[in-house]
Amino acid sequence: MPQPLIRRTSRPAAAALTAAVLAVTPLALAPAAQAATGETAATVQTEGAPVTVAPLNVLTYNVFLMSKNLYPNWGQDHRAQAIADADFFQGHDVVVLQEAFDNAASDALVARASDEYPYHTPVVGRSTSGWDATSGSYSSTTPEDGGVTLLSKWPILRKEQYVFKDACGADWWSNKGFVYAVLDVNGVRTHVVGTHLQSTDSGCSSGQPATVRAAQLTAMKTFLDGKRIPASEPVLVAGDLNVDFHGSEYPSMLADGNLAPASSRTGWTNSFDTTDNSIAAYRYPGEPNEDLDYVLYRADHARPQSYGNDVHRFHSTPWTVSSWGKSYTYNDLSDHYPVIAG
């Protein structure tokens, strides 16, 4: 099987390959009520903001569909089909996927889910085709795309991609950034950003990943500020933010991104679990568990009075792949668990 070369993700090289929350912070964060089963129930009080919308039902999922050119034996084609068919994948307003890197597998997943989600964006950084606008540091010569795409039950009125300038380690070689989509949700203009921030990577210098993530969140905030979106319209940010909910970087993440914390965080303790998840356990033995995936509302825009993020611990039917005459069996569809907000 492919060995874990670098942690969790794959930024653009230069033009060629050579070369605050309105000061919003959680007012009270209850310690996670952590049972032996790994379930959590964290409750957060949020500061006042326009409360005018019902919660949007959003699924965010890092699907670990790495390019088969680099990782040929991770069952990408099987997992793409199984993800689209999984019960947890059904019935949402919006789905945001990360690490949809493999072209064929990601295209197959989107196609298979098209009855449930008839509207979708292209994958960030794969090309400029299909977007209403491209901004940031997109480069057609970057080896890998950004892996983020958005699927929707509701019509997409506008779709833009933004490619981050800042990156380190393996992320430097991908067009990572964010998708910005404007949806018509029962007549309400709803803005959704899907993203995958800088991974913690041994190829980065000490402290650099957190610095890069802060710069990426600031770039996203500046982009959204420039849109002059009315405060009455909700703005959501969903994705693998690579910031541990249980860690010290979490308050800074909220402030840098102008994000309001969810009212509660429930379900499994960690969305990235190297002991409970069979793929994560194989790829990252002994590494710490982390809670990295979120659906959050912008702090100074309309948002629900109460909504939660639920880490959905899902194990699949076992599937087997072979490499160099040896078989490997897993019972998960990704090295992350999905997070559902609503």
Feature-to-residue mapping (PLM):
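Active-site beta-strand/loop signature of hydrolases that rely on acidic residues for catalysis
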Residues: N57-V63, I83-D107, L151, A181, ...
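Structured beta-strand-rich core segments of catalytic domains in phosphoester-bond hydrolases
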Residues: V94, A100-Q198
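Metal-dependent phosphoester-hydrolase catalytic domains
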Residues: Q3, G226-L236, V243-G342
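Short, surface-exposed beta-strand/loop micro-motifs that present aromatic residues
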Residues: G48, N175-V182, Y294, T329, ...
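Surface-exposed cleft-lining segments at the edges of enzyme active sites
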Residues: K68-L70, Q161-A170, L197-R213
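N-terminal, active-site-proximal structural segment of metallo-dependent hydrolase catalytic domains
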Residues: P2-A20, P26-D115, G125-T134, S140-D145
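Stable alpha-helical elements in mature extracytoplasmic
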Residues: R79-I83, A105-L109, G147, E160, ...
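Extracellular/periplasmic catalytic domains that process cell-envelope and extracellular macromolecules
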Residues: P50-A54, F88-Q90, R112-D115, S140-E144, ...
